[in-house]
Amino acid sequence: MRLMSITIQKDACLVCYACQAECPTKAIDIDSFKVCNLCMECVKVCPTGALVEEEIEVNGKKLKRVNYLAHKCEKCGQCAEACPIGIKKVDDDFPYSKGHCVLCQKCIDVCPIEIISLPGVIDKPKKEIKPPKEPIAVTDACVGCGICVPECPVNAITLENNKAVIDKSKCIYCSICAQTCPWNAIFVAGKIPKKRRKEVKKFEVNAEKCIYCLKCVEVCPGDMIKVDEENLIVIPPKSCPACKLCVNICPVDALDLEVKLSSPHPITDEGLVIVEEDFEVLKKCASVCPTEAIVVDEEKKEVRMCIVCGACTVACPTGALKLGKIEHNGKEYNRIEFSPYLCDKCGKCVEVCPMKTLRLSRGKLPLKGYCVMCLLCLSVAEKEKKGKKVLELR
């Protein structure tokens, strides 16, 4: 028997969370790209025999996997403590012990671009990712879904002949389109974009409305919508790239897809970024921000933060907003500079702000919500969460 584990080609991943949603034991975490490597450390430390090593045959080869016997589990947590990659956890929701791979291969089957494999047993050809060298480029992978169009803060993207077209005279190269593209078809500055986190809150089909025309099945670029021939209905996946081509093509509006996107990342991996969305800590960070660039939504328990994309500086007709520089720890960072005496309160900056942090205000400071990179918030975050990063300067 051999120890084989699931592998994911990280650089090609769409971050659609389909594999994570499909995994019955929560052995995949896409945000951190952690996958159970079947090291069997959890089995070794389990004091009750609830976790056992088991032999399974896959494609004629004998492999080892972890089996969980819930009736023996005392929820002691020793397995989670022993896990070297931190994917194992124990809680009160069944199955109590999670994060071990059972080699069910559901993740392999559901991946829309076939980048998940079981090396030596189920091999998928490695996808070569070669970002175009242009400042910004839309590749042939574009499916014409239009998800990028409303996300652009300066309205530089249109759809022409079912493909995204970028007006380079308007584009500010903030990379929000690349971060948001469901099918990895947009690249900025020749780099593979860091994708925005995505949560499919709801993906349902109305059985009474569905006429079984299968147009949604045909249009799905990843073949992720399945057919129930017996009941004459389609079955959407638990999670997917969420391009909404299926929703748009449905002639009877039978599909309901609700998606929540996280805030965009900074233009590069450098700058002030939220590492962990700890609402209470971030709320304290917001309280010290001199320009109120961290906005707290108490109702939704969400926090938005200026990402210094520069969209406001491009939209400003008076020159009141500029993209400046500031040095921290010997390194130069972008920041937003505001000259109140030049501001005529036209509100154009507010309209284009992708994070919706900018807002007009009365008094000596007519505009709030832009980041000056003073790092007061970072000081609070480090004080409140010792040993655990909530904010980070990269």
Curated annotation (Swiss-Prot):
One of its GO terms (molecular function) is metal ion binding. It comes from the Archaea. Keywords: 4Fe-4S, Electron transport, Iron, Iron-sulfur, Metal-binding, Repeat, Transport. SUPFAM superfamilies: 4Fe-4S ferredoxins. [4Fe-4S] cluster binds at residues 13, 16, 19, 23, 36, 39, 42, 46, 73, 76, 79, 83, 101, 104, 107, 111, 142, 145, 148, 152, 171, 174, 177, 181, 210, 213, 216, 220, 240, 243, 246, 250, 306, 309, 312, 316, 343, 346, 349, 353. Residues 4-33, 26-56, 64-93, 92-121, 133-162, 162-191, 201-230, 231-260, 292-326, 334-363 form the 4Fe-4S ferredoxin-type domain. Pfam families: Fer4_4, Fer4_7. Its cofactor is [4Fe-4S] cluster. The keyword Iron-sulfur applies. The keyword Iron applies. Binds 10 [4Fe-4S] clusters. This is Polyferredoxin protein VhuB. It comes from Methanocaldococcus jannaschii (strain ATCC 43067 / DSM 2661 / JAL-1 / JCM 10045 / NBRC 100440) (Methanococcus jannaschii).
